[in-house]
Amino acid sequence: MATRATHKRWLKVSALVIGFFGPVLTLATMPATDELARLGLDILTWPVDGFPTYASDEMRFLSALTGGFLVGWAVTVWLLSTLVHDAAPEAVRHAVVYGACAWFVVDSVGSITSGQWPNAIWNIGVLLMVVGPMWRPAED
């Protein structure tokens, strides 16, 4: 079983997993640096067929918003690990696990209702990487 120290370390893994996508999406706001995000979204909306594109200003704007939210969420999780976890480890675990589950449900439902169901399957892997051993309370 996982210990509090394991959970605290895993919070940093969670922050890095969440935060990775933020700069990628923010870079997609500029035509010269949008290919990684475009390819990533193409893979998430399987099959790889050139959809979606970053041709519209709306897509670039939504990438800016999403990138910012993801970086902010990642910084929050990192700071929960470094500033709060020692004082309230179970509360931090709950906050991150429930937050990740809320993201999973809303993002997956939105993906399915918009016809992009493959993303809901990818979301399972992301959820498992974010939550990791924090599904259960620490044993110490």
What label would you give each PLM region?
Residues 105-122:
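Membrane-helix boundary connector in multi-pass membrane proteins
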Residues 62-80:
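Alpha-helical transmembrane segments of helical membrane proteins, especially in multi-pass transport
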Residues 28, 54-60, 77-91:
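Short juxtamembrane and helix-loop transition motifs at transmembrane-helix boundaries
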Residues 20-61:
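Membrane-helix boundary elements
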Residues 3-11, 55-62, 89-96, 115, ...:
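Membrane-interface helix-boundary signature
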Residues 1-27:
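Cytosolic juxtamembrane helix and N-cap/initiation of the first transmembrane helix
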Residues 43-44, 125-136:
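Alpha-helical transmembrane segments and their membrane-interface exit regions
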Residues 11-18, 67, 97-100, 104, ...:
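Residues within membrane-spanning alpha-helices of integral membrane proteins
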